[in-house]
Amino acid sequence: MIYKIFIKNKIILITDDIHILKHITDRVLIKYQPNINEIIDILKDFSDNDVYQQLILISYELETFYIKFYNLFKVVLGAGGVVFNETMDKILFILRNGVWDLPKGKIDFGESDEKAAIREVCEETGVCDLTLIKRLDSTLHIYFSNNEAYLKETHWFSMKAKENLQLIPQKEEKIEVVQWFTPDDIRANWDNMFLSIKSLLVSNNFFKL
């Protein structure tokens, strides 16, 4: 079992499988049986370190450790959509703060994650006539703000929409462009996407390099 979490544009893996170490590079930081009380400091150091791109936390009591890890953070729930056109050969992307991303945002109080995902896509792209296809794996992202540690848990759904709908970027959310991407477009902009978005696309076989 491996838990994957993102921090800035880096990966944290939490596992009890030492065989993962066979595939590491010199840009990987490894912590064996880390003390849960030291985790926040470890994460801050890793986040600010330019040398390491991946952190592996190895615990032989994985489930217990992960629950304690999860409880270190204030959890923020979000939802978003991987929106396909009708022929399933294009994906809807947004350009926010100069980075290509997928439409997503916070879940409102009392709102289901499905409704939140549809609402966020509608608000951020102007595409509101959406058909849900299926629930995808969630992504986890750690960030720090005002001396607090947060874990954003985003619930993703694949969706379908007509390609000829008007695209309206939500300017107040700093969205500059909404655009349908072909696989070639994704490949051309791959280096200007967040690692979590790349992982979501690849793990669901929506894109292959």
Language-model-detected regions and their locations in the chain:
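Short hydrophobic/aromatic beta-strand or adjacent loop that forms the aromatic wall/cage
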Residues: I2, G78, K152-W156
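Acidic, metal-coordinating catalytic segment for phosphate/diphosphate chemistry
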Residues: I36-G80, E86
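Conserved Nudix-box catalytic region and its N-terminal flanking loop in Nudix hydrolases
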Residues: L21-Q33, F84-C122, V127
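Conserved beta-strand and immediately adjacent loop positions that scaffold enzyme active sites
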Residues: G80, K90, V177
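Unchanged
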Residues: I107-L195
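Nudix hydrolase/Nudix homology domain
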Residues: I5, K10-K31, V99, Q170-L209
